[in-house]
């Protein structure tokens, strides 16, 4: 038996199926934070940096606040007053990076994504090994440079000890 396309019950059936797919599809709200930077044991460093997100883009100047603890957690905020441009968080098992002006965030488990130099800044400053696509160097003036050789994202800056 063939059912005509324009029947009211068919439109209702399609609506119910569409609603079912939306509810059963499983959406997850983006993680706001992996942890809260509060309490004793946090080492806070402040500084300034120039960030070029990728090849062909202009550099952005801003302030860095980096907080780390002995459990291996690190929080980095890069801001141009009054707005946060990048927030990066790493733990030994998870990572999260947010770009508030664009309303974008990326998160994962295990080693951080090699796509974002911000996720490796603390490790680079601590002298830890980096993925081959990242290059870190210290400068004679006490500053540093972290570069993603693939995307040509660069971070040039300094932080107080």
Language model segments and positions:
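Bacterial Sec signal peptide processing site at the extreme N-terminus
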Residues: 21-42
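Secreted/luminal cysteine- and crosslink-motif detector
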Residues: 10, 25-28, 88
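Bacterial N-terminal signal peptides that target proteins for export
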Residues: 3-16
């Amino acid at each position: 038996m063939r059912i005509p396309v324009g029947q009211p019950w068919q439109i209702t059936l399609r609506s119910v199926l569409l609603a079912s797919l939306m509810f059963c599809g499983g959406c997850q709200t983006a993680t706001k934070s992996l942890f809260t930077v509060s309490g004793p044991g946090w080492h806070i460093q402040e500084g300034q940096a120039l960030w070029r997100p990728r090849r062909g883009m202009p550099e952005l100047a801003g302030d860095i606040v980096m907080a780390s603890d002995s459990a291996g957690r690190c929080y980095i905020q890069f801001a141009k007053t009054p707005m946060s441009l990048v927030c990066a968080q790493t733990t030994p098992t998870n990572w999260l990076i947010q770009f508030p002006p664009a309303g974008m965030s990326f998160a994962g488990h295990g080693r951080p994504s090699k796509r974002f130099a911000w996720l490796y800044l603390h490790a680079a400053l601590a002298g830890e090994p980096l993925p081959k696509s990242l290059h870190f160097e210290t400068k004679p003036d006490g500053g540093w440079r972290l570069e993603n050789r693939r995307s040509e994202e660069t971070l040039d800056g300094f932080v107080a000890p």
